[in-house]
Amino acid sequence: MIRNVLGYWGVLVCALCAEPAVISLPTANQHLFGDEPEKFYMYVNRTFEGETSKPWEGGSFGYVRSPIRVGGKLVMSRFHEGIDIAPVKRDKAGNPLDLVMSISGGRVVHTSPISGRSNYGKYVVVEHDWENSKVYSLYAHLSTVTAKVGDAVNAGSVLGRMGYTGAGLNRTRAHVHLELGLQMSTRYGSWHDHNFGSANYHGNFNGMNIAGVDIAGFFLERRKNPELKFSEFVLSRPMQFKVTVPAGAAEPEFLSRYPWMRRKGVPDHVSWEVGFAATGHVISFTPSKRKVSAPVVSHLRPSDIPQRWLTRGLLTGEGNSASLSAGGKKLVSLVLDSFPIVEAASTR
């Protein structure tokens, strides 16, 4: 027992003492660092309350799309899980020429060269080993994919070329959609087959299994503080809600992948209080003595705006009261691996 505990804390200390990863933007577009967001992000076409516009904000991370009025307040109702980086060079026909490169060292773990198999179009996923944790970057809407699964890459290694493959894009709005995130489960295929009728062509590297963090925010914070670690950035994100879940016989596999998320708690715990950002990614696991038989919302940042607009539909309710929606329950089950094992998980 003592060896196990010391082993756990040894891994945690080692992770927190690890050197910060070397990172760089994935294309020649560096306007994020020049305080020129309108040149960095690809705009979205918007019509709202009779006015049309092309706001660059729609290409940034977070709740930045589909404005609505809720109780007289302007609310962005759609969550964008990555950032859309505009091209800096096009050919005479208007096709983007920008090369798309890995943001950091790692290994190519997935390529999807058939555009019709995902809303991402043609995309690549790179696995990074940061602080003894696996973190994933995703590069979507490519015109061509040159990387191959198993390739070792460095920051700046070419993965493909920018394009406009995928849902709802055209040549004018060509861009690379970039995500940086955490893997929710190593059994995603079973979860997908249990919850959906559609084919999963991407195994554990389906975009639904990668919980995106504010990647532009990470780049900007690292610009100010080159010693900032990814774990420190994630742990600093505002908490929107917490869900208390029954503790199983073993620690959640998610926590074994990201041990730096474990907070101090009570000994002999019977549950975990899992903290979530408004964007739906996990921030913390805290041991708790609260007895619950099923996941229950145990903490909430109050708001007079219905929680579904603030949590991408993971919660229902408003004010100081909320509960998990059907989508929220599915997300929690994915994080906890609490779903049936489907023997014939889809690999089509």
Which sequence ranges carry the predicted segments?
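Bacterial N-terminal signal peptides that target proteins for export
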Residues: 1-9
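A general structural signal for short secondary-structure junctions and capping/turn motifs
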Residues: 3, 75, 168-170
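Hydrophobic h-region of N-terminal signal peptides that target proteins for export
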Residues: 9-22
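Surface-exposed, glycine-biased beta-strand/turn segments
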Residues: 20-122, 164, 201-347
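Short beta-strand-turn/beta-hairpin segments enriched in glycine/proline and small hydrophobics
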Residues: 83-85, 124-139
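Solvent-exposed coil/turn segments that connect beta secondary-structure elements
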Residues: 88-90, 105, 113, 129-131, ...
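Conserved, short, structured surface segments that act as functional micro-motifs
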Residues: 117-127, 141, 151-226
